[in-house]
Design a protein with these regions (language model features):
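Short, charged helix-capping/linker segments at alpha-helix termini
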Residues: 2-5, 20-29, 39-58, 160, ...
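Internal acidic/polar
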Residues: 4-12, 97-126
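Structural recognition of an alpha-helix C-terminal capping motif at a helix-to-coil junction
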Residues: 40, 54-61, 74-86
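Arg/Lys-rich amphipathic alpha helix in sigma70-family domain 2
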Residues: 65-72, 82-102, 117, 169, ...
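DNA-recognition helix of helix-turn-helix
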Residues: 85, 89, 127, 135, ...
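A short pre-motif secondary-structure segment
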Residues: 138-142
Length: 184
């Protein structure tokens, strides 16, 4: 089903075309527009700010090297999100040491005063690391990227029903992990 282009899609196409026409300011505009969402997806996928910054730089390097191959019939945000997920998966595959489940889910030492909201966010972040990378990508894009099932399917190049299935599996796994954290 062909989607009606949005104003955002038109703006993206315009920026890409300006860049391809030699307007280097368009590169800055594209980075300004997508740096935060790309970093957020990478951070949620990788679980650490330094890796997310490195991945974000790699993504933008790839974007500008590959813009001549971008097909404007497709949404730019899907293209750049796909690159972000791929780069994040590459980083995850390249990590030499695997942290044990117990280490990933370690609760801060007793006596450490932590705001409940920050502690809950930290528990969710740690729980995300337990998910398989494909499941983590679906959760990150849905809940931190606010993408619809159809948009996630477009980014990950899978059917929407696969997105729904992965999301169900991931939520169940997260629920189990989070309940085990609270049930000392």
């Amino acid at each position: 089903m062909e989607e009606t282009p949005t104003a955002s899609d038109a703006a993206d196409r315009s920026l890409v075309q300006r860049y391809l026409d030699g307007d280097r300011r368009a590169a800055t505009d594209l980075v300004d527009r997508y740096q935060r969402p790309v970093f957020t997806v990478a951070l949620r996928m990788l679980g650490n700010a330094q890796d997310a910054e490195d991945a974000t730089q790699e993504v933008f390097g790839t974007v500008f090297r590959s813009l001549t191959t971008y097909d404007p019939r497709f949404r730019f945000f899907s293209w750049i999100y796909r690159m972000t997920v791929n780069q994040s998966l590459n980083v995850l595959k390249g990590r030499k040491t695997m942290v044990t489940l117990e280490e990933q889910l370690a609760i801060p030492a007793a006596g450490v005063a932590v705001d409940d909201a920050l502690e809950a966010e930290e528990q969710v972040r740690k729980a995300l690391t337990v998910l398989k990378p494909d499941d983590r990508a679906v959760v990150v894009l849905r809940y931190f990227g606010s993408l619809s099932y159809e948009e996630i399917a477009e980014v990950l190049e899978v059917p929407a029903r696969t997105v729904k299935s992965r999301l169900f599996t991931a939520r169940e796994r997260l629920r189990t992990v989070l309940l085990s954290q609270g049930g000392d």
